Each structure stands twice: as structure tokens, then as C-alpha cells.
Amino acid sequence: MAEKILVVDDDPDILDATTMILESQGYQVVTARDGIEGLAVLKAENPDLMILDLMMPKMDGFGVCKELQDPRWSKYKSTPILILTSVREEASRRRYELETGLELDVDDYIEKPMSPDTLISRVNTLINKKKS
């Protein structure tokens, strides 16, 4: 059975492109358009990996990661998180790396716009890491 990946992003173009890239590699993809919907889909679908945009309405990626640290979500602790970010400036990148890496316990990040090869490589690495 194909691994299931949850993609959470408020940009429909990013959702469509990411879905197309991942499905071309044999992954099953489920999507959500904001953090609140993303948490609901996480609970309903129990994916093998979550790809999460940082900047979204209702609840952003930081909020989702913080929520997942609550003991109520402990069942999903082993679900790898790949962050999508538009953060480019050095100061913003340092803040991002500190907040997400140290505080929010994410596994990796990728900058937008992303190349399909980079996305596939990062996803494959995280999926294989979870399997082992």
C-alpha cells in the first residue's frame, strides 16, 4: 500500500503542484488548506508524513507544531513533519531554524519555490527514516 502524505497549504497552486509531484512517485496524497483543517485530516487519515506550510490563515504551521506537542496528540509524535517556508533572509532563517528545529520538533524544511527533485528527495528520506 502506498504511503500517505498530508499536505497542508493555503495556496491552491502549491497544493496542486505538490500533490501532482508526490502522486507521480506513487504516494497517496490528502490535503488541507489551513492548520485547523490539517489537524482534523491528520486525525482522520493518520498519514505517514505531514508537509506543512508555515504561513496560513486560521492556524499557521507554528501553531500546528505547538498543538502537536500537547499530550492529546501523542499518537502522532512519530509522524515526520516537513515544513514549507518562504523564509529567505538570514535573520528570518535563523529565527525559523531556532523555533522550528528546537522548539517545534520538525524533521526538515524546504524553501518555496521548491524544485520537484528536492521535494521528492526530502520526502523519500523522511518516509524511509520513519520505516526504519
Regions found by a protein language model. Give the residues of each.
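Active-site residues of response regulator receiver
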Residues: 9, 53, 85
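Charged docking surfaces used in two-component/phosphorelay signaling
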Residues: 16-24
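Short hydrophobic/Thr-rich beta-strand motif most characteristic of the beta2 strand and flanking loop
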Residues: 26-33, 41, 110
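Acidic catalytic/metal-coordinating carboxylates
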Residues: 34-37, 60-68
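Active-site beta3 strand of CheY-like receiver
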Residues: 45-51
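Receiver (REC) domain active-site loop signature in two-component systems and cognate sites
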Residues: 56
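Alpha4 helix (beta4-alpha4-beta5 surface) of REC/receiver domains from two-component response regulators
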Residues: 63, 77, 88-108, 117, ...
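The C-terminal output helix
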Residues: 121-132
